[in-house]
Amino acid sequence: IHAALRNENILALVVNNCVFGMTGGQMSPATLIGQKTTSSPAGRDLAYNGAPFDVTKALKDFDIAYLARGSVDSPGEVMKVKQYIRKALEKQQRGEGFCLVEVLSPCPTNWGLSPVDSLTFMREKQKAFFQVGEFVDKNAEGGM
C-alpha cells in the first residue's frame, strides 16, 4: 500500500484464489462472504470477519500508473490477463510508476470442488464480487 501511495516503480502481481492455499486453505482477506475454509468451516461471516478485501477498490484513487484485474476461467480471459501483465511491464520499463495486476484463480483442492465446478464458482461467485477489467491506466490514449 505504501509503495502505491508513493507511486514507486514497482509491479505487484497478485494471485487471488480467495484462500491461503499453500498452507491448508485457511480464510484469506479475499475469502468471500459465506465461503467455507479450514479456518471458517461455517463460512466467512460479515459481522464477525468483516468484508472481503478488494485491492482494486483500495488503490483506484491513488496516483498510480496501472491497476487491473483479470481471470483465468477461460482462454479469452487468460489472453486479457496476458495483455494486462504486458501493459504493466511496459509501464515499468518506461518508469511510469506503481502497477498492480490481480489475477483471479481457482483453488479446486482447498475449495473442495472439481476443476470444472471451480470454474463455475469463479464465474458465478468470485467474478461477481471481484469485477474484472482495467481500473487505472495513467498516460493511456483517451485516458481512463
Predicted regions and their residues:
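Short, ordered loop/turn segments at secondary-structure junctions
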Residues: 15-18, 72, 104-106
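Short acidic, glycine/serine/threonine-rich loops at helix termini
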Residues: 22-28, 111-116
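Conserved thiamine diphosphate
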Residues: 29-94
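A glycine- and small-aliphatic-rich helix-loop capping segment at beta-alpha/alpha-beta transitions
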Residues: 1-10, 28-35, 117-121
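Thiamine diphosphate
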Residues: 1-21, 83-87
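Flexible, low-complexity linker and terminal segments
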Residues: 93-144
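Short glycine-enriched loops at secondary-structure junctions
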Residues: 16-19, 26, 52
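Structural motif
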Residues: 9-13, 19, 57, 65-68, ...
